[in-house]
């Protein structure tokens, strides 16, 4: 079954109802919006959009951490994830919110401190706070990709 969503980046689109995720507590700062669609702009892009189903202007660019850094492990207690049906963050899919400066796209950063954990089986998600003090809210993605590729050589 498809659902119609109005978005600013893509206009009015149809998404499969399986792409709709419930966030029981919303996202930090946007608690009143508890339903989002995970939209893939293109198969080649490492980025996806987390688009509110209720507010066309509310969308976040997200990325999975393993695409630009090694061994990201959020410091989250297992109890924090029980309300979305997970016993550990390792059982979920992790996304990080990306910020892209208008004047410097190469300066794009990911928020390591506020990971979004998804339970794909139940269609639920939650934004948590990682208590690891080394997790920056502005981890440079391009620099991290370059570091990761130089480690493989």
From Swiss-Prot:
Belongs to the FliW family. Pfam families: FliW. GO terms for cellular component: cytoplasm. The lineage of its organism: Bacteria, Pseudomonadati, Spirochaetota, Spirochaetia, Leptospirales. This is Flagellar assembly factor FliW. The gene is fliW. InterPro entries: Flagellar_assembly_factor_FliW, Flagellar_assmbl_FliW_dom_sf. Interacts with translational regulator CsrA and flagellin(s). The keyword RNA-binding does not apply. The keyword Transport does not apply. GO terms for biological process: bacterial-type flagellum assembly; regulation of translation. It comes from the Bacteria. Its main location: cytoplasm. It is found in: Cytoplasm. It comes from Leptospira biflexa serovar Patoc (strain Patoc 1 / Ames).
């Amino acid at each position: 079954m498809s659902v119609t969503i109005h978005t600013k980046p893509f206009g009015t689109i149809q998404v499969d109802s399986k792409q709709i995720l419930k966030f029981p507590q919303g996202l930090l700062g946007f608690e009143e919006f508890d339903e989002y669609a995970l939209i893939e702009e293109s198969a080649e892009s490492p980025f996806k959009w987390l688009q509110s189903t209720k507010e066309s202007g509310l969308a976040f660019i997200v990325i999975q951490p393993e695409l630009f850094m090694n061994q990201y492990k959020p410091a989250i207690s297992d109890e924090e994830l029980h309300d979305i049906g997970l016993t550990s963050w390792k059982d979920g899919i992790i996304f990080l919110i990306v910020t892209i400066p208008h004047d410097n796209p190469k300066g794009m950063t990911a928020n390591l401190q506020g990971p979004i954990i998804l339970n794909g089986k139940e269609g639920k998600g939650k934004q948590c706070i990682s208590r690891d003090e080394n997790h920056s809210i502005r981890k440079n993605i391009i620099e991290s990709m370059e570091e990761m590729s130089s480690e493989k050589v």
